[in-house]
Design a protein with these regions (language model features):
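N-terminal basic, low-complexity leaders that serve as flexible interaction/assembly modules and, when applicable
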Residues: 7-92, 144
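Short beta-strand segments at enzyme active-site cores
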Residues: 80-83, 151-154, 207-208
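Gly/Ser/Thr-rich helix-start
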Residues: 39, 95, 157
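Pocket-flanking alpha-helical
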Residues: 91-94, 138
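Short, Lys/Arg-enriched N-terminal segments with co-localized hydrophobic residues
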Residues: 1-6
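Active-site-proximal, glycine-rich beta->alpha crossover segments in alpha/beta enzymes
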Residues: 98-202
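Conserved, mostly hydrophobic/aromatic
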Residues: 30, 72, 138, 199, ...
Length: 208
């Protein structure tokens, strides 16, 4: 999955990753991994048992904070990545999203402009507020590490999220999405434009 990354910094402490990104020279190379949190960690597998529903897990500040911090605690990485999922956006928009064990995410497909218009973006930030609460707690916990790790925000790229919303889940060839985009670009762009707007708001709120 392609993701948009942003740095969430609310402290004046020097952070290796931020300084290197700003062009400063260091003998040490900052390290973070795209999938540094999650199922490869035994402590995550134990933590995951505390919530039957994966989206509920993502919306729980307590659980998402711990999932974010676990790889920092284990590997001393230079940045934590906000533990979340790209499908919180369609879920917040009102699309039916379910994570089925053994199958992955299943969504009620968006098939036309009428389906797009049923999506409600007015309360997205309110719906996602537990994620922003988690960010505040993550920042506080990261201060406990002497090497001052940064925090990288998280959201799915609009095209990637759109493919899940249109296909109703993962796909090998994304035929339905590509067909709609090529045959009715003005219709499909309404979904992309909506996702660009909502995702931008979500990322800005992560910084604020």
């Amino acid at each position: 999955r392609r993701t948009k990354l942003l740095m969430i910094e609310k402290t004046k402490q020097k952070k290796l990753l931020i300084e290197v990104l700003n062009g400063d020279k260091h003998d040490q190379i900052p390290i973070w991994l795209m999938r540094q949190a999650g199922r490869h960690l035994p402590e995550y597998k134990k933590l995951r048992l505390e919530s039957e529903n994966f989206l509920d897990f993502c919306y729980s500040p307590k659980l998402s904070v711990e999932a974010t911090i676990q790889p920092i605690r284990r590997y001393n990485l230079d940045a934590a990545i906000l533990f979340s999922d790209i499908l919180v956006i369609p879920d917040a928009l009102g699309q039916q999203v379910e994570f089925v064990p053994g199958k992955g995410p299943i969504l009620k497909p968006i098939t036309n402009v009428s389906s797009i218009k049923k999506l409600n973006q007015r309360k997205v930030l309110q719906y996602l507020s537990p994620i922003y609460q988690a960010i505040e707690k993550i920042i506080d916990q990261l201060k406990m590490f002497s090497f001052n790790p940064s925090l990288i925000g998280f959201a799915g790229a609009p095209w990637t999220v759109a493919t899940y919303m249109v296909e109703g889940g993962s796909s090998k060839d994304y035929h339905t999405t590509r067909k709609w985009a090529y045959e009715s670009p003005h219709e499909f762009s309404q979904l992309i434009d909506l996702l660009v707007d909502v995702t931008s708001q979500h990322l800005i709120q992560q910084i604020d």
